[in-house]
Amino acid sequence: MSKILVFGHQNPDTDAIASSYAFDYLSQKAFGLDTEVVALGTPNEETAFALDYFGVEAPRVVESAKAQGSEQVILTDHNEFQQSIADIREVEVYGVVDHHRVANFETANPLYMRVEPVGSASSIVYRMFKENGIEVPKAIAGMLLSGLISDTLLLKSPTTHVSDHLVAEELAELAEVNLEDYGMALLKAGTNLASKSEVELIGIDAKTFELNGNAVRVAQVNTVDISEVLERQEAIEAAIKDAMAAEGYSDFVLMITDIVNSNSEILAIGANMDKVEAAFNFTLDNNHAFLAGAVSRKKQVVPQLTESFGA
């Protein structure tokens, strides 16, 4: 019997890596499954900081499940097939642990599926450790905490669930870190954009959404200075246009998020800019506009685009 691969979404962020890493451990300890954690991309700088801090080896990167001899997969931090492994339609989805909308998803067989409207997939996995009476090792606690901090911007994002505060406190204690100090260090590690090429920058944290027949790419970068990113606008737009031509995206929306002041600048290019402007009730000037208080793609960008596109 081949191993069940456990992984997060393409262009993995910290929650994708952390939740899959922890769920792989839980699957073996609590459910007796023969699993292996893998990743659909290399860790970004924020995730690398967490992995290094807690002495965790990055999961190996794969592109196909069948190429690894696997016929079954477990998805964490995503469920939409266009965000998953290349041959997702050719394998059996054994389980899903997620905190996003459910869309473009169907299976031939029954499966384990746990989806909750909380701040991170890591929050759900931690709760499952407790439910099954499995002790959380320090390194796993640290990674789960990192996933929660990353997705909620240290519990400041509107996606933060009331239960996430207690989860963060408990995980910080298990990981033996100060929540605020470690949280800020983690987030700042992810804002080093100067060393990134424009191609890398628009792919750090990007997901594709099928909206009423349109392939809309929504990417996000975190920074402490939006103006520094906009100084590279011409080169960023060139990279975006190349990606659109290569991948067939109808529209590309880049969130440039200020993690200190909790605002974003939206840079958008594509065939449906009228719908993008209507979604956020703003007017793009030189392809970008300010979106006050916006820090969450999941709650403050994708639902608005979905409604505006009539999806």
Curated annotation (Swiss-Prot):
First and last residue of the signal peptide: none
Pfam families: DHH, DHHA2
GO molecular function: inorganic diphosphate phosphatase activity; manganese ion binding
Domain of life, per lineage: Bacteria
Requisite cofactors: Mn(2+)
The keyword Cytoplasm is assigned to this record: yes
Keywords: Cytoplasm, Hydrolase, Manganese, Metal-binding
InterPro entries: DDH_dom, DHH_sf, DHHA2, DHHA2_dom_sf, Mn-dep_inorganic_PyrPase, Oligoribo/pAp-PDE_c-di-AMP_PDE
Membrane spanning stretches: none
Residues that, per the record, bind Mn(2+) 1: 9, 13, 77
Reactions accelerated catalytically: diphosphate + H2O = 2 phosphate + H(+)
Free-text cofactor note: Binds 2 manganese ions per subunit.
Subcellular location: Cytoplasm
Residues bound to Mn(2+) 2: 15, 77, 99, 151
EC number: 3.6.1.1
Enzyme class name: hydrolase
Primary location recorded for the protein, binned into one broad class: cytoplasm
GO CC, alphabetical: cytoplasm
HAMAP family, per the entry: PPase_C
Similarity annotation: Belongs to the PPase class C family.
Protein name in the entry: Probable manganese-dependent inorganic pyrophosphatase
Source organism: Streptococcus pyogenes serotype M49 (strain NZ131)
